[in-house]
């Protein structure tokens, strides 16, 4: 997988908004020879949901650089003859496999889309409002009331791509990681004799007998990466999913003087990023052995083994010496770890229910004086009622006033000092107070 730096984006923020539910309809049956037909207002359709879907054909998050807002379709309003409005179309947003989805405000991890086809709902659509056919009773046979649709959910999300690879190559810049991955796999990264040639992670598939695994070439780290020196440690997140870390060390002495020090500097930067990385299995790859004498090489390899307490495999990415042993070792470790990993049970995706807030029967009311002779009735749960119904509809007003009276509205108005003739506002509806 070769991607230009400008095309590789592994962290973005996007805004998602699910569709609102359609409004219910106030309608009455009108047919020839049926002079007084009953209510037949249909329900509104549900708003569309927003889903994220892991798509293996998507490699980076670059599609979200220029487009950051995604909105699903609203539900259609209900109609007469008990016709339900059409549901809004769900919106599916494809992201790379390995994308971690977080709430951008709280930082909560919503989902880890680490398998092809995995889906997560990130915003639920609002339920459609009920038409007046639902409000008919033996006493009220022609109700002038219908519900508004519920608002769909909205939120800011942070998408973070963590590449899925079995082996992660880490080390200083210019130690030969790119040459190594091009030697052992089908990857063909840019290779040059200067630091930071690799600016993005490169992936390569390695085949060993009947077994294959994926290796990631992580851009070089240097001392101070955790403070943003060089390319920083922004790419270390791609190592988090690897089974095995292959720590590449330049033992030639031409560009790096002390391979043991180099090893521990990189380990310290990994620790600062996440101590969890130090718990991963690791082998040390001593590269560029073609540039050093055999006797000197043996001394360096012994120092590395004694200091790191790791298996050290000497190789030359240029001549190919030691490559077969390295591939065999990597394949053996990865194969063993994949067998040990318990099989995941396939999770069947179930679409959640649309947003629908239950109307509270009892709630606190507050009467606020806005001007001389002008008062406003407020309350958190009162707002839910006001959003649910159109108070221009006669029966909606009567129903709400009955609920408010049960919650002591009249006493609240008197306690606040409302006088006869004063104007009281509830939502967008105003009325003149009478004792």
UniProtKB/Swiss-Prot annotation:
Superkingdom: Bacteria
Binding site for Mg(2+): 178, 198
Sorted UniProt keywords: Cytoplasm, GTP-binding, Hydrolase, Magnesium, Metal-binding, Nucleotide-binding
InterPro entries named among the record's database cross-references: G_OBG, GTP-bd, GTP-bd_Obg/CgtA, GTP-bd_prot_GTP1/OBG_C_sf, GTP1-OBG_CS, GTP1_OBG_dom, GTP1_OBG_dom_sf, OBG_GTPase
Binding of GTP, residues: 171-178, 196-200, 217-220, 287-290, 316-318
Domain OBG-type G: start-end pairs: 165-335
Gene3D superfamilies referenced in this protein's UniProt entry, alphabetically: GTP-binding protein OBG, C-terminal domain, GTP1/OBG domain, P-loop containing nucleotide triphosphate hydrolases
SUPFAM superfamilies linked: Obg GTP-binding protein C-terminal domain (SSF102741), Obg GTP-binding protein N-terminal domain (SSF82051), P-loop containing nucleoside triphosphate hydrolases (SSF52540)
Gene Ontology biological-process entries: ribosome biogenesis
A GO CC term attached to the entry: cytoplasm
Entry's EC annotation: 3.6.5.-
Subcellular location: Cytoplasm
Entry-linked PROSITE patterns: G_OBG (PS51710), GTP1_OBG (PS00905), OBG (PS51883), OCT (PS51881)
Main location: cytoplasm
Domain OCT: 357-435
PANTHER family recorded: DEVELOPMENTALLY REGULATED GTP-BINDING PROTEIN-RELATED, MITOCHONDRIAL RIBOSOME-ASSOCIATED GTPASE 2
Role, per record: An essential GTPase which binds GTP, GDP and possibly (p)ppGpp with moderate affinity, with high nucleotide exchange rates and a fairly low GTP hydrolysis rate. Plays a role in control of the cell cycle, stress response, ribosome biogenesis and in those bacteria that undergo differentiation, in morphogenesis control.
Assembly information from the UniProt record: Monomer.
Homology family: Belongs to the TRAFAC class OBG-HflX-like GTPase superfamily. OBG GTPase family.
Protein name: GTPase Obg
Species this chain originates from: Thermotoga maritima (strain ATCC 43589 / DSM 3109 / JCM 10099 / NBRC 100826 / MSB8)
